[in-house]
Design a protein with these regions (language model features):
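Zinc-dependent metallopeptidase catalytic helix centered on the HExxH motif
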Residues: 134-206
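Surface-exposed patches in mature extracellular/periplasmic domains of secreted proteins
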Residues: 87-107, 161-170, 188-194, 255-262, ...
Length: 338
């Protein structure tokens, strides 16, 4: 008999003793956790789901009949992805959709119940993922390291906690960080062509003439989904991801953690105006430089054509990038006082 436990947007179950192998917990009513509960009701789809609790997240399925060994490995990989985000960003999302205090990732039975292949709250916990029953689980049975991009991408939606300090790059952040997870966890990337295209994009851009703000923001004539180069995909989020992958490979893990720490120190700006988009882009450059403890103008200004004014160049020329306590927010304040 199914046992139901329901409470607003969080659900609490009687926790089983910790063991090496994960087993599904008692059924719970997902209706209060669903992103679009009316759609479930209209389609007359049962909202009972079963949680597979890991150390970091709870993965929900419509049946508890899956192989515990396969599910243990899969949930373990999702745990590692979540931990990777925590390690680098240094800040957890606001707890929203949860089971026993753990962020929920729900395997929905129909993509029309949500917003597509995957859906995630921005800055708060809660992910819905499609295709688990039709393909993902079958692939996991063959190779437990075959984790679809969408899980790590949607975690990036949850972990975008920067607000308008960096909102020009909300989607680009998720695209970039999914590859950080894939590389860090050494899982299988079944779309190598897309990864190769993204890796090459920043080098191709560097050799071209398209300006920085038109390439990396949406406030200078091109929409988010328009390709910036002749190859595809090279839309705005991809270009940011390509640039960040280049910086990460060049500067390393400690740099990336420091980079996000510095992003949090920045002031907020509108992302839909030319001035605001430029200010957010300036913050990107400064945060990257402070994290590197050196001026990255050679990359951002010379190679990527960021429009740094002569006055800004002069001010930054006097900065001791290794100064203790220096952060990107303080530099922005210094530049805006000029």
């Amino acid at each position: 008999m199914r046992t139901l436990f329901l409470a607003a947007f969080s659900l609490s179950l009687i926790s089983a003793p910790v063991s090496a192998e994960i087993k599904a917990g008692p059924g719970l009513d997902y209706a209060k956790l669903a992103f679009y509960p009316k759609r479930w009701k209209e389609k007359k789809i049962d909202t009972i789901m079963f949680p597979w609790e890991g150390k970091e997240i709870a993965f929900l399925t419509i049946t508890d009949g899956f192989d515990p060994k396969v599910m243990t490995q899969f949930v373990g990989s999702l745990d590692q992805g979540w931990s990777t985000y925590l390690k680098f960003t240094g800040k957890a999302p606001r707890l929203n959709r949860q089971v026993n205090g753990k962020p929920v990732i729900a395997a929905i039975p129909d993509g029309n119940l949500s917003c597509g292949a995957g859906c995630g709250y921005v800055g708060a916990t809660g992910i819905e993922a499609n295709y688990f029953y039709s393909s993902t689980y079958k692939n996991l049975q063959k190779n437990p390291k075959t984790i679809p991009h969408l899980y790590f991408y949607e975690m990036g939606r949850n972990f975008f906690t920067f607000g308008r300090k960096h909102s020009c790059y909300t989607t680009g952040f998720a695209v970039f960080m999914r590859y950080v997870c894939i590389d860090t966890l050494n899982v299988v990337d079944n779309d190598k062509r897309t990864r190769e295209t993204i890796n090459k994009a920043i080098e191709i851009y560097s050799k071209g003439e398209l300006n920085f703000l038109k390439t990396f923001t949406n406030a200078h004539g091109l929409s988010e989904k328009q390709n910036r180069l002749q190859t595809s995909p090279t839309d705005q989020p991809v270009m940011y991801a390509s640039a960040m992958l280049h910086l990460w490979k060049l500067l390393g893990d400690e740099w990336l953690s420091s980079y996000y720490k510095n992003i949090h120190t920045l002031p907020s700006f509108a992302d839909n105006t030319r001035e605001g988009a430029r200010s957010q882009s300036l913050g990107w450059y400064l945060a990257a430089s402070v994290a590197a403890q050196k001026d990255l103008a050679e990359i951002f200004v010379k190679e990527w054509r960021f429009p740094l004014s002569n006055e800004e160049k002069q001010t930054l020329s006097y900065i001791n990038w290794k100064e203790e306590g220096l952060d990107a927010g303080k530099l922005m304040e210094k530049l805006f006082k000029k």
